[in-house]
């Protein structure tokens, strides 16, 4: 699988392009500090840190408690499972919304 295909797949699961690039870089290169990541990915720290926060909130990236923090990627297979689980939950919500909308539709005179 090519890098571009991996990035596009992660985007399809709801990650932004920068989130996908940050995750893949950490997964392939190992734990890095924010400054190292920003330099390697040629992004500003102002672009990087919201992405890292988003990835941490999704359970895709972890950070230690040191200063400066060292960021690590969660195993790719586990990330795929997490992202698939999110999509399955979203599909359930959509199905429930469909039922509610159909009920509302039928009650409209």
What are these regions (language model features)?
Residues 5-19, 33, 62-86:
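Short, cationic-aromatic polyanion-contact patches
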Residues 20, 45-46:
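Key DNA-contact positions within bacterial/archaeal DNA-binding proteins
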Residues 21-25:
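Pre-recognition alpha-helix immediately N-terminal to the DNA-recognition helix
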Residues 27-33:
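Short capping segments at the starts of secondary-structure elements
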Residues 36-41:
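A short acidic, leucine-rich amphipathic alpha-helix
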Residues 51:
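Residues within the DNA-recognition helix of helix-turn-helix
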Residues 54-57:
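Alpha-helical DNA-recognition elements
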Residues 81-109:
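Amphipathic alpha-helical dimerization/coiled-coil segments
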């Amino acid at each position: 699988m090519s890098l571009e295909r991996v990035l596009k797949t992660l985007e399809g699961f709801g990650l932004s392009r920068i989130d996908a690039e940050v995750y893949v870089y950490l997964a392939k290169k190992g734990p890095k500090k924010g400054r190292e990541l920003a330099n390697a990915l040629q992004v500003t720290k102002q672009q990087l840190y919201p992405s890292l926060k988003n990835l941490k909130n999704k359970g895709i990236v972890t950070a230690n408690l040191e200063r400066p923090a060292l960021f690590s990627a969660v195993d790719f297979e586990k990330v795929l499972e997490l992202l698939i689980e999110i999509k399955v939950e979203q599909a359930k919500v959509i199905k429930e919304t469909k039922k509610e909308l159909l009920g509302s539709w039928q009650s409209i005179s």
